[in-house]
Amino acid sequence: MATAASNPYSILSSSSLVHDSAIMQQGSPFRNPQKLLQSDYLQGVPSNGHPLGHHWVTSLSDANPWSTSLGSSPLDQQDIKPGREDLQLGAIIHHRSPHVTHHSPHTNHPNAWGASPAHNSSLTSNGQPINVYSQSGFTVSGMLDHGGLTPPPPSGTTQSLHPVLREPVDHGDLGSHHCQDHSDEETPTSDELEQFAKQFKQRRIKLGFTQADVGLALGTLYGNVFSQATICRFEALQLSFKNMCKLKPLLNKWLEEADSSTGSPTSIDKIAAQGRKRKKRTSIEVSVKGVLETHFLKCPKPAAQEISSLADSLQLEKEVVRVWFCNRRQKEKRMTPPGDPQQHEVYSHSVKTDTSCNEL
């Protein structure tokens, strides 16, 4: 019988594990586990002279009773057993850590503890085999702490495959910032658009062009005809930011063309080519307005001959007199509510008043 100093399980047998000291005395197969081969183990078992020990080894090698539970024979697999200090800490402090961990093909770790096929069982001095899985210190619950018979993967592998560490660095933000910085150089701000719209309206009125003239001029110069409503909405800042940015350079070029052509001998022709020039508003003197008002009270809708004779007497264009009578009739309709006296009665009363005023 070997001494207690040569038994690596002597400390555990007296403290945490409930094993017979006589059972765990055989320690020679575990002294150098990395040097012990399967052939040496098979040669050493029959020399003890116990028939059950030899029968146990041969039956495992032939019938393979472990195939139904663990997938392969313990003699064909490479088992992993911790050393002395690991067993002591696992039994006394960490009660949940397994004393025996099967080494399966899924968890092949070359840098694990020293492995040997002889670690699956221990022999007593009489040569009787002891199955360590049947002892109280090696319960099934200890083997199933990590779920099933499959041992947990090494900690290094788990940490290296952590989802957070596997996530690639997102460079989308960097690309978007780069594109944003590039676009900011060309895209004007809302304040710049507001200031340009104000200046454009002032310069357009100063040059004598309507909003429709600008739309036609853009179609003549650049091939994009814009309506009067579009130019109006641009000046009122009622277009979308994207459309404002698209329309701003076109209007800016049109202003540059209009300013450069001003003062030259052919400035009128160039401006007329850009679009329909705005007609100047006709200003009528107060005395002339009185004469027209008198004729309107007499005849709200004069004939073409009367308009021509009146235009000649007032030294006005025939079109100006015609437009004035047309606007005056529209004004009368807006001012006269329904149900009032007939217009000819009002006109006759007004004629007398106006005649007296004119004579004065």
From Swiss-Prot:
Gene3D superfamilies (UniProt xref): Homeodomain-like, lambda repressor-like DNA-binding domains
UniProt xrefs under InterPro entries: HD, Homeobox_CS, Homeodomain-like_sf, Lambda_DNA-bd_dom_sf, POU, POU_dom, POU_domain_TF, TF_POU_3
Annotated GO biological process: brain development
Domain POU-specific: start-end pairs: 185-259
Keyword DNA-binding tagged: yes
Keywords in alphabetical order: Activator, Developmental protein, DNA-binding, Homeobox, Nucleus, Transcription, Transcription regulation
Single GO MF descriptor: DNA binding
Chief place of localization: nucleus
Gene Ontology terms: cellular component: nucleus
Stored SUPFAM superfamilies: Homeodomain-like, lambda repressor-like DNA-binding domains
Entry annotated with the keyword Transcription: yes
Region (Disordered): 98-130, 143-191, 332-360
Function: Transcriptional activator. Induces neural-specific gene expression to act as a key regulator of neural differentiation.
Family: Belongs to the POU transcription factor family. Class-3 subfamily.
Name of the molecule in the record: POU domain, class 3, transcription factor 4
Organism: Xenopus tropicalis
